[in-house]
Structures are given as C-alpha cells and as structure tokens.
Amino acid sequence: MQRSTPKEMYHNPQNVYTAQFIGTPPMNIVSNMVKGIQVGFRPEKTSLIDPGDAVLSIQGRIITKEQLGAEMNYSIETAFGKVMVKTEDDIEGQECRLYIREKNVFAFGEDGNRIPVTEEIKKALEQVEKGV
C-alpha cells in the first residue's frame, strides 16, 4: 500500500491499486498490450488529436460520448479493451485514434507494482501503432 499525499499518489502511483483509486475517471490499465506488462494512462492525459510526440497510438471506436461542460468523456473500444478518455477534443464519427505522450505512460509488472518505462517498453509501445 502506498502512503503519501493525494497529489503524489496521482502523479506517481506505485501500484495499480493506487493508480486506479486516485482520479476520476480512474486510470486506464491495459494488460494485453505488452507481454508481462500492464500499461497505464490517465483519461485526462490522452488526446484524440495527434500531438506529434506520442509514444503510444491506439486505434479505437467511440462507444459513448458525454459532454460535461467544456470537456468530453469518451468510452472507447480498442483491440485491448475499453478505455476512457477525458478531453476537450470534440471528435465527430465513431472511428478515432488515441495518443499518449511518453511522460503520461505508466508501466506496472504482473504483480501490479510500478516499474520503469524502459527503452524496451517504449519500443514495444511504438510497435502497437504498427500492429506488430
């Protein structure tokens, strides 16, 4: 169990439980993207418009779209399961692509504990877009 301030737990979660406990909607955790690794990214740190420096790009289909003031909450089906995106990006149509910058990607081992995002993991994430 991680014991620290809510701000520290949000920005630097040490395990999957903490990563999903802090934040609304909770952090997306994908288990079948990179072998032996659980990949995490926060809905509000995910873009539907290419920022040009994303380390991870995932094709998806919008299931639901909910406007909450200036922000939109999307539920998106991907090859890796359903994920949530919270953004100001207002996308038309059902097909979309999710973009996540390197600084917003978290890696967790099979035991749920945080591990560093190594060069090997980054290369594996870059291959996801290529369908490798």
Predicted feature locations:
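Non-catalytic connector elements of ABC transporters
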Residues: 25, 35-132
